Regions:
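Basic, polyanion-binding surface patches
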Residues: 1-205
């Protein structure tokens, strides 16, 4: 199943516990679910540290995991104790957020600052149980982007080289060489579809 739902973006989620211990973990069940306002979701198998911290203080950040940070991301996936600081374990520096308390990964070229909106218990979660699958939805209240990746007002995502999760232990990476542009077709007055022609005209459809 997971090998077919691919590639999947990686949500590198940072939270803070009640005793101010930092937590950092990657989640490949992650994606945007709405824009204007912006919402993201990630799904946790069992009530893990990230979920507990988010439900306690209502905030998290999501840093973009890239080719350059792949080793740190992998270290932060280790199933360590609840009070372990994965930033320290992975030798990753933090950078302060503007609108939430949890920091972002300093080396990440982009990050989202989020407020917890809702946790949805999927059907395999028994009442009061910490076992099963939990979907966490957050509203994005702030966005950080490294200026060097903004060109003519457009984010050059491919230059960031974000990682993607495949199946099994496989990963992918987005690069300028593996991306391409396709214009969407238009519908003519007679109802027929007209194929897009030429270069992208700069209009989002």
């Amino acid at each position: 199943f997971k090998a077919l739902i691919a590639p999947r973006p990686i949500g590198w989620i940072a939270t803070i516990s009640e005793d101010n211990t930092l937590n950092l973990a990657p989640y490949s069940f992650f994606n945007a679910v709405a824009a204007n306002p912006n919402y993201v979701m990630f799904s946790s198998v069992e009530r893990k540290d990230s979920l507990r911290n988010i439900e306690q203080n209502g905030e998290f950040t999501c840093s973009l995991s890239t080719w350059d940070t792949r080793d740190g991301m992998n270290v932060s996936s280790a199933p360590v104790d609840y009070l372990a600081d994965e930033f320290a374990l992975a030798n990753l520096e933090t950078a302060p957020s503007q609108f939430v308390t949890p920091p972002r990964v300093a080396r990440a070229p982009a990050a989202l600052e989020c407020k917890h909106w809702k946790t949805i218990n999927l059907p395999d979660v028994a009442p009061g149980s910490d076992d099963g699958h939990f979907m966490i939805i957050g509203q994005v209240v702030g966005i950080y982007i490294d200026d060097k990746f903004i060109q003519d007002g457009i984010v050059n995502t491919a230059e960031m080289r974000p990682l993607a999760r495949m199946g099994y232990m496989d990963y992918g990476v987005i690069t300028p060489e593996t991306t391409f542009v396709m214009q969407r077709p238009t519908v003519k007055d007679d109802g027929n579809v007209e194929a897009a022609k030429g270069e992208w005209d700069g209009v989002y459809r």
